[in-house]
Regions:
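Acidic, Mg2+-coordinating catalytic module of metal-dependent nucleases/exonucleases
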Residues: 923-982
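Conserved DEDDh/DEDDy metal-dependent 3′-5′ exonuclease domain
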Residues: 843-917
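N-terminal accessory regions of nucleic-acid-interacting proteins
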Residues: 780, 787-811
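Short cysteine clusters
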Residues: 734, 739-743
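Conserved RNase H-like, two-metal-ion catalytic cores of nucleic-acid enzymes
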Residues: 802-871
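Helicase motor core with emphasis on the C-terminal RecA-like subdomain
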Residues: 32-75, 79-82, 86, 92-190, ...
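Short His-Asn-centered micro-motif
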Residues: 367, 386, 546, 605, ...
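Extended Lys/Arg-rich polyanion-binding regions
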Residues: 408-411, 417-434, 452-464, 480, ...
Length: 987
């Protein structure tokens, strides 16, 4: 039975937890009642009390200034915790530091004190405080003002929030007079500060510190983007002569220093040992008989009646809305004191909920990970995790939201049906013993790197020696952008300029694709990213927003919008689809127990082919509705296991369902990988195939779900042996017989978890682990696309121009230009070029190395000469010269091999350039006259002058052609007045 189906079932009337205790926020009494409960007590598989720990204090190596010491005294802070003292020492010394200690350990002081001290010492100094959420910025400004309140008003540091809600008037005031502490977010840094750095001179010239809060959120796609944003920030600071110290604040993760260094490319010192005290905390693991959602509703209802301030975390937007809806039905008089909270809400809705929770108006909130970060919603007593959050880090981070200010608290993990949930129900001690996962990013993601190279070049020209281009893959991306006309080299070929002035708005830092708006009745009610839009908001899908059910009536892909209408139905929907993969490049290979494992670049094609309607009560399949949606095609990184032929033969001999075995292995491995990598299964995709055409063997693929890849499967490849053993343990340890969501079923399987054979999968994994049937063939894929970047130290395009290959150069070519008798205005516009008539036509013939002039009555001879050429070159020849000729005399140019230089320029740049402009920049010459003068000469009978002018145009066009052929580029003056290169290939 599905989660939704179970959750909608009626309950017995006895309360799960006796609620006859007086209100008083007594967490211990709540926990005792839960354990003693007849309905739920026997489902508690583990209860651990984490004891309170005392504070560990330390003095900074150098005493704070009198002003800062006075701030601490006024705030009632007699001493710093040990981690605060260590981190402030580093930040005050100008070192880059990453502080990764538990939630509510006082990390704010580690960066606030050094910044305040520097501002008081040097009023010209500035700092940027970067927060991933607007609400965090509001909280931080309040904290700064409270701490600085004891200073004389004239000495208090100024602060300002600069985000999307800041009015244009205040934005201008902030730019003109930057505050000591500018509080902003990644988007504003990317979209406003960096591209307009000349308007922020006082900020960047005085920048001493950059504070990055919630660093652990900068992983995956967003982290890969931010790695480039921080490098761009470093370039701009270098332009203003500053080198600010970075201070990172993070939840406890496995690699804070490595992540900070990957984000910035700078050496970073870590502080991970917390000196903050902690209150006692109960941790309970509960494996429900009903769904996790049903159990969460029961626990929340009981907590509300006891006055416990509670947060419930769910794994999806949909489940957040459903639990919020169901608790209102169960909570009686407390129904109005609970709200849902998720990222799809509009900003003003989220702010209202945060304020109501902080004030105590709300007792409970049901949230996605959107409230995992340190937004101030007041002191909480109870955290209910409706399903394992996907990582040990997230579980501790969410649990850390409760029990602040020394209050006893409790965290209840309610297991779902997923593999990791059940894994920890069977091995609870491992949850507490496991170190937190490592966060990974992939700055080398080509799709992401290319976007930021263009942004960086728009901010400041990129020298070929710039550290941005140190990586060979990034250099290759720069060359590709140059070939596309998005980056332009200067005349000397030593610097890149951006072709566009503001490419920044085409870059979405928080996703690899764009956002779709969700509209109801003409009003925007939410947003969804492109990858999810196809699966969750396809036509006919059920979409829930703030407890209201909607039906999707249209998915408008060109306009990037989803149209929904309110609708009450007794079913939910689940997308169905199919996927294929092509191997583009092998990045790594090894063997695990004799099994070949590869890492590489993949092209994934995913098509949503339809959707299931399933009854809300019980999950019964009602119907399958076909859909006709375009495929999603993207390149990413992934790993694949090649199943040895002897292993497949062994399964076939035992009459196992081989496709069911590898399909189950794929699901189980995706489910278990979040134990090894900081991610959740929704960030990964998989494909299993009994015969991959490039490999010639059965393969199981697991890939990064984000275009370009974000490093998840790279880390999984490094831990491939552990991934295999963990997958076997998950399958073998599950008590089900034929497969379930706890081992080999996937909640997002596009084929409805068919075929699946758990028994066969277990046998398959045991054979792979045994090493008894190794694959002797290397199994390297065939038909790879060679796309190797240049090696370090290899000369780049500035040193070795991409001249046209000899085999592509024509043996005999001509250059043609035509002058007319009549102007466009005389024949009704440029569309009537065929009515203009020919005054003179000039053809340069490379075989003769001479120019021949033709009058209108000599055009048949011109046509005959053209047919003898291997290539005809012109400037606007296709749209103009050929049309003029066709109107003057019967002429069919379609069989002539033609190169139109203007057409190539337009295709590369997106706009047109004049022949005169190209000639001046490239050749240092120019046209001898203009077309208007030639028209006047025709009326005056000055044919020789027209012929001389036309011949000069032909010579200029010829020289542009040969320059581009020999050098691989032309030169032109861009919109900023810079002489830059335009790459060309005359093929």
């Amino acid at each position: 039975m599905t989660v939704a189906g179970k959750a909608m079932q009626s309950e017995t009337h006895s309360p799960p937890i006796p609620d006859d205790e007086p209100d008083g926020r007594d967490v211990a009494a709540y926990v005792a009642a839960l354990i003693a409960s007849e309905r739920l007590g026997h489902l508690v598989v583990h209860h651990r009390v984490l004891p309170a720990t005392p504070a560990v204090f330390a003095d900074p190596a150098r005493p704070f200034s009198r002003a800062v010491a006075g701030l601490l005294t006024a705030k009632g802070i007699p001493a710093l915790y040990s981690h605060q003292a260590r981190a402030t020492d580093l930040a005050r010394a100008g070192r880059h530091v990453a502080v990764a200690t538990p939630t509510a350990s006082g990390k704010t002081m580690t960066y606030l004190l050094p910044v305040l001290e520097e501002v008081i010492r040097n009023p010209d100094s500035r700092a940027i405080f970067l927060y991933p959420l607007k609400a965090l910025a509001q909280d931080q400004q309040k904290a700064i003002r409270e701490l600085a309140a004891s200073l004389p008003e004239s000495a208090r540091p100024t602060t300002a929030i600069y985000d999307g809600d800041t009015s244009p008037h205040f934005r201008r005031k902030i730019r003109d007079n930057p505050p000591h502490i500018l509080i902003t977010n990644p988007e504003m840094l990317h979209l406003s500060l960096l591209p307009n750095h000349e308007n922020w001179g006082a900020l960047f010239a005085g920048l001493s510190h950059v504070v990055v809060d919630e660093m652990h959120t900068y992983r995956g796609v967003m982290g890969s983007h931010m790695a480039h944003v921080f490098r761009r920030l470093t370039r701009v600071c270098r332009r203003f002569g500053t080198s600010p110290a970075y201070v990172f604040s993070s939840a406890t993760i496995g690699n804070p220093g490595q992540l900070a260094e990957d984000l910035t490319g700078l050496p970073v010192t870590t502080v991970t040992e917390s000196g903050a005290p902690t209150a006692a905390r109960h941790f309970l693991f509960l494996n429900p008989e009903q769904s996790a959602a049903t159990t969460a509703v029961m626990l929340l209802a009981a907590a509300l009646k006891r006055g416990l301030r509670t947060i419930v975390y769910t794994q999806s937007r949909k489940m957040t809305e459903l639990i919020s809806l169901w608790i209102r039905e169960k909570a009686g008089p407390y129904a109005s004191r609970v709200s849902a909270y998720r990222s799809g809400f509009l900003a003003e809705e989220r702010r209202d909920i945060e304020a109501a929770m902080a004030s105590g108006k709300l007792l409970g909130v049901v949230s996605t990970s959107a409230l995992e970060l340190g937004i101030d919603i007041g002191g909480l007593d109870l955290c209910i995790l409706c399903g394992y959050p996907g990582s040990v880090m997230s579980a501790w981070q969410r649990g850390g939201r409760v029990g602040r200010a020394g209050r006893e608290s409790a965290v209840v993990l309610i297991a779902g049906e997923d593999a990791l949930d059940q894994y920890f129900m069977r091995h609870p001690a491992e949850f507490f013993d496991r170190p937190p996962e490592s966060a990974v990013i992939n700055p080398a993601n080509p799709a992401i790197a290319a976007k930021h190279l263009e942004c960086a070049a728009a901010e400041l020209p990129i020298e070929l020696t710039d550290p941005l281009l140190a990586d060979a893959g990034i250099r290759a991306e720069a060359e590709r952008l140059e070939q596309q006309g998005l980056l332009l080299r200067d005349r000397e070929g030593t610097r890149y300029f951006a072709a566009r002035k503001r490419p920044h708005r085409d870059v979405n830092l928080r996703g690899s694709g764009g956002q779709f708006t969700i509209e109801a009745g003409g009003a925007v009610i939410g947003q969804i990213d492109e990858m999810r839009a196809y699966r969750e908001t396809h036509p006919g899908a059920v979409y829930i927003h703030r407890g209201v059910s909607y039906l999707v009536t249209a998915l408008d892909i060109p306009e990037r919008r989803v149209v929904v209408a309110p609708g009450t139905v007794d079913y939910y929907t689940r997308a169905r689809g199919q996927k294929t993969t092509e191997i583009l490049e092998v990045l790594g290979e090894k063997q695990v127990n004799g099994v070949p494992v590869f890492l590489g670049r993949l092209k994934v094609t995913e098509t949503v082919t339809g959707y299931e309607r399933r009854r809300a009560r019980g999950g019964q399949l009602l119907s399958i509705v076909p859909l006709d949606l375009p495929p999603m095609v993207f390149e990413t990184e992934g790993l694949w296991w090649v199943i040895p032929q002897d292993v497949q033969a062994e399964l076939d001999k035992r009459l196992f369902h081989f496709m069911g075995a590898i399909h189950a292995m794929e699901h189980a491995m995706i489910g278990i990988l979040p134990l090894l990598v900081l991610t959740d299964r929704n960030d990964l995709g998989g494909i299993s195939t009994p015969l991959h055409p490039q490999v010639g063997r059965a393969c199981v693929f697991v890939y990064d779900g984000a275009p370009g890849g974000v490093g998840l499967t790279r880390l999984a490849f490094a831990k491939a042996d552990e991934a295999l053993s963990r997958t076997l343990a998950a399958v073998a340890g599950c008590p089900c017989e034929t497969g379930c969501p706890s081992c080999v079923h996937s909640p997002k399987c596009g084929s409805g978890n068919r075929p699946i054979d758990k028994v066969a999968a277990r046998y398959l994994l045991e054979l792979l682990m045994s090493g008894k049937l190794p694959e002797t063939d290397p199994c390297r894929p065939e038909g790879l696309i060679s796309n190797e970047p240049p090696q370090a130290g290899e000369p780049q395009a500035a040193d070795k121009p991409k001249a046209a290959k000899a085999k592509n150069a024509p043996g005999r070519y001509g250059v043609l230009d035509v002058e007319t008798r009549r102007a466009a205005a005389e024949v009704g516009g440029w569309g009537n070029a065929h009515k203009m008539g020919v005054s003179v036509a000039v053809l340069y013939d490379s075989g003769l190395d001479d120019c021949i002039t033709y009058a209108q009555d000599e055009l048949p001879a011109l046509y005959e000469a053209l047919t003898r050429l291997d290539l005809v070159v012109g400037f606007n020849i296709l749209r103009f010269d050929y049309k003029v000729l066709a109107g003057a005399s019967p002429f069919d140019h379609r069989k002539l091999p033609t190169l139109d230089i203007l057409e190539r320029v337009h295709a590369r740049l997106g706009y047109r350039l004049s022949l005169d402009g190209l000639a001046k920049a490239t050749l240092g010459t120019q046209k001898s006259a203009s077309g208007l003068e030639a028209l006047a000469w025709w009326k005056e009978g000055r044919i020789d002058e027209i012929a001389a002018y036309c011949k000069q145009d032909v010579i200029v066009t010829r020289d542009l052609y040969t320059f581009g052929r020999d050098n691989g580029y032309l030169l032109f003056s861009n919109k900023a007045g810079k002489i830059v290169r335009l790459p060309v290939e005359w093929e």
